[in-house]
């Protein structure tokens, strides 16, 4: 059954103001939805199985939507609710429109419920979303624009609309879950950074996953990472118009290969790599605009530069000057667990990329680094690791593998790189396992090496989330033990 429930902005606001709305989920996203509904003056009921934070539990809500007398006029779901959950299926069967938090906030904003509509920027992809979102927000702010990060990081989108200090630019990190429930969401500009098999149990197929991601490109200025074959083909096959290209290649060479109105890429020179914009003028000549040095970007390596290039391509739509972009980029500090350098001692750098929860993310995390001691393992969720090992193996000094699916990684390492030193950590205590892993990595590492936590797997086999896993890695790397390993759960989207 289709999940699309198309509403126009004004009709959505009219429903909220005059009829009953159900909000599925009372977590962070749900609270943001509630804040927005209260700002509009809506009548709503929160659905959650935690009685202390809800008006209805799931069973009660299913009964309500199944009756014409008690069914809501609209159901707004938090992104964690699966399309095949009984409540959402019951709502759709009853003809109740189902939308997500991004869709609801965008509709309310476009209707003018909170003043002049804002500018929306959507950033999605299998990996790199958070860093690219934070970079984009920092660049806009450096250019003097009132911008805030919303969605998976920063402020829930609904809460951003009712904030005391208005933001004119909403930079939304949007997961495939959120886009799934956003049938009419049309950002002013958006980017798909990359695509790899992920969350297929949620979306049902790679086609479903990719189709949901494509919704970020429906605006008038879509940005496409043309180095990524799946992204490039997705945009081409679906006829996405007016594509702005971002690439790690020389932008003039990209422009020569295909027609784009504008390309942002990387130009190598004797002074180092420079992020550069190239466009074709009306007279056919190339207009070349150097934007910022690509040297010393955080996080280090190609993945960090790729995120910076995408962010530059997005903000140039709003005439942010290169000097402001450069200032923001070189003052930027990566968020925790996303390639953050957490310790440096005896010539060895320790890097926490606990957010690399799938093989594609691990490849990005390790790319560009040499002499790596790799700390890996956790829940693979059925992901294949053959290509991952083939890609990263040549750069490894050694590996330390822990977690419930460690045997598969160890087996593949032995098959492809039989001489590589590999330490297995069988301890299943969260703190004990990480303490052993860090101790083993310290033994393997030599001056000039990088010890990188890039698990290629989810963390919930042992940890409360990827944040706790990364915190413990950093704490033991610094020699402070488990005292920092107390972060609350953080989801892995």
From Swiss-Prot:
Function: Cell wall formation. Catalyzes the addition of glutamate to the nucleotide precursor UDP-N-acetylmuramoyl-L-alanine (UMA).
InterPro entries cross-referenced by the UniProt entry: Mur-like_cat_sf (IPR036565), Mur_ligase_C (IPR004101), Mur_ligase_C_dom_sf (IPR036615), Mur_ligase_cen (IPR013221), MurD (IPR005762)
Positions with a binding annotation for ATP: 125-131
E.C. number(s) listed in UniProt: 6.3.2.9
Top-level taxon of origin: Bacteria
Family in the record: Belongs to the MurCDEF family.
One Pfam assignment: Mur_ligase_C
Name the record gives this protein: UDP-N-acetylmuramoylalanine--D-glutamate ligase
Cellular component, GO, one term: cytoplasm
Organism this protein belongs to: Corynebacterium urealyticum (strain ATCC 43042 / DSM 7109)
Keyword Lipoprotein carried by entry: no
Keyword terms, alphabetized: ATP-binding, Cell cycle, Cell division, Cell shape, Cell wall biogenesis/degradation, Cytoplasm, Ligase, Nucleotide-binding, Peptidoglycan synthesis
Principal cellular location given in the protein's record: cytoplasm
GO MF term list: ATP binding; UDP-N-acetylmuramoylalanine-D-glutamate ligase activity
GO biological process: cell division; cell wall organization; peptidoglycan biosynthetic process; regulation of cell shape
UniProt subcellular location: Cytoplasm
Group of enzyme by EC: ligase
Record pathway: Cell wall biogenesis; peptidoglycan biosynthesis
Catalytic reactions on record: UDP-N-acetyl-alpha-D-muramoyl-L-alanine + D-glutamate + ATP = UDP-N-acetyl-alpha-D-muramoyl-L-alanyl-D-glutamate + ADP + phosphate + H(+)
């Amino acid at each position: 059954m289709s999940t699309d429930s198309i509403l126009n902005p004004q009709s959505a606001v009219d429903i909220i103001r005059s009829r009953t709305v159900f909000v599925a989920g009372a977590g962070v996203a749900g609270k943001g939805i509630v804040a927005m509904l209260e700002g509009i003056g809506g009548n709503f009921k929160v659905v959650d199985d935690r009685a202390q934070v809800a008006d209805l539990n799931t069973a009660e809500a299913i009964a309500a939507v199944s009756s014409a007398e008690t069914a809501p006029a609209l159901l707004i779901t938090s992104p964690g609710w699966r399309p095949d959950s009984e409540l959402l299926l019951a709502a759709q069967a009853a003809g109740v429109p189902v939308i997500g938090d991004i869709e609801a906030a965008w509709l309310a904003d476009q209707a003018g419920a909170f003043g002049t509509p804002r500018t929306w920027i959507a950033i999605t992809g299998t990996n790199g979303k958070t860093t690219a979102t934070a970079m984009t927000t920092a660049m806009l702010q450096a250019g003097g624009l009132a911008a805030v990060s919303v969605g998976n990081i920063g402020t829930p989108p609904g809460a951003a609309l009712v904030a005391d200090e208005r933001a004119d630019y909403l930079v939304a990190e949007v997961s495939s879950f959120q886009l799934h429930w956003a049938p009419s969401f049309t950002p002013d500009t958006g980017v798909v950074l990359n695509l790899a098999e992920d969350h297929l149990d949620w979306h049902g197929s790679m086609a479903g996953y990719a189709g949901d991601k494509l919704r970020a490109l429906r605006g008038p200025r879509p940005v496409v990472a043309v180095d990524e074959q799946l992204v490039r083909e997705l945009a081409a096959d679906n006829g996405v118009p007016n594509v702005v290209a971002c690439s790690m290649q020389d932008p003039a060479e990209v422009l020569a290969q295909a027609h784009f109105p504008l390309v942002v890429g990387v130009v190598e020179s004797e002074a180092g790599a420079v992020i550069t914009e190239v466009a074709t003028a009306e007279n056919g000549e190339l207009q070349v605009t150097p934007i910022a040095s690509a040297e010393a970007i955080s996080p280090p390596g190609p993945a960090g530069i790729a995120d910076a290039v995408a962010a530059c391509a997005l903000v140039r739509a709003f005439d942010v000057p290169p000097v402001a972009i450069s200032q923001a980029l070189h003052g930027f500090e990566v968020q925790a667990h996303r390639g953050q350098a957490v310790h440096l001692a005896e010539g060895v750098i320790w890097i926490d990329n606990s957010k690399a929860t799938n093989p594609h993310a691990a490849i990005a995390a390790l790319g560009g680094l040499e002499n790596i001691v790799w700390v890996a393992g956790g829940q693979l969720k059925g992901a294949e690791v053959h290509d991952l090992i083939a890609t990263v193996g040549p750069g490894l000094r050694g590996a330390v593998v822990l977690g419930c699916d460690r045997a598969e990684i160890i087996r593949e390492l032995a098959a492809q790189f039989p001489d590589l030193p590999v330490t297995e950590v069988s301890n299943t205590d969260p703190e004990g396992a990480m303490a052993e892993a860090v101790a083993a990595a310290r033994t393997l590492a030599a001056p000039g090496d990088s010890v990188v936590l890039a698990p290629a797997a989810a963390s919930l086999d042992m940890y409360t989330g990827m944040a706790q896993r990364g915190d413990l890695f950093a704490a033991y790397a610094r020699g402070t033990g488990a005292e920092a390993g107390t972060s609350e759960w953080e989801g892995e989207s």
